[in-house]
Amino acid sequence: HQLTAAQSIEIQPHAARVGERWFTDIPMAQAVDVLAALCQRQSAAQALPVRQAALSHETHEGALTQDNFWQTLQTFIRPGDIILADQGTAAFGASALRLPAEVNFIVQPLWGSIGFTLAAAFGAQTACPDRRVIVLTGDGAAQLTIQEMGSMLRDNQHPVILVLNNEGYTVERAIHGATQRYNDIALWNWTQIPHALSQNAQAECWRVSETVQLAEPVYGGSGCARH
């Protein structure tokens, strides 16, 4: 979005601009304090959002779709989780999740560098060993930093890693080169990756292609192939 000067506030180290008017000899800290107070006053005047009812654990039939995947994941999240969403499909879908109390949501939209989540998840689980870490990543992003899964297995960490296997760089296809080969990636046998990265892998892996198959990894039910 393009904002005109009249629609914006600019804060510099020793001056501030409100609309077209500049105010000098104002320290940045003081200007930020004033702006924060104004923002709080404005937010207090806004109506609170209506809390939606919790989703049920009803399992949908048929092929796994974006809608069914994110609806199921919504019921899986619990208070205190740490959720990391990689760039692309994962971040776009996760942005609509309703987060319970004490959940940390880590996403990196500014630079848009794919592949950060696996390494960041290793750090998050190291810093918070008693919290559940959930990773949402695409297959293309995961291939860039998959070696950090070996670090997780070495340290006996147990994050939940959900790889959205789109067989390539889906966001790049949408931006440029929808049918170009450079947006294709090598197809991996993802359920065997933990065993390749650790001699003593204590990992449970599932391949999910239908919505009902999410019952095993998410709800502890049955119906999908465990590897």
Regions found by a protein language model. Give the residues of each.
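Short beta-alpha connecting loops at secondary-structure transitions
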Residues: 16-21, 104-107, 144, 171-183, ...
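Glycine-rich, acidic loop regions that bind phosphate or pyrophosphate groups
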Residues: 1-50, 176, 213, 218
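Conserved thiamine diphosphate
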Residues: 1-10, 41, 45-46, 130-219
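Short gly/pro/ser/thr-enriched loop/turn and capping motifs at secondary-structure boundaries
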Residues: 15-19, 91-92, 112-114, 142-143, ...
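Active-site diphosphate/adenylate-binding microenvironment
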Residues: 49-130
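Glycine-rich, anion-gripping cofactor-binding loops and their flanking helix/strand elements
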Residues: 1-9, 100-131, 143-147, 177-179, ...
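General beta-strand structural signal in soluble alpha/beta enzymes
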Residues: 10-11, 83-87, 106-107, 135, ...
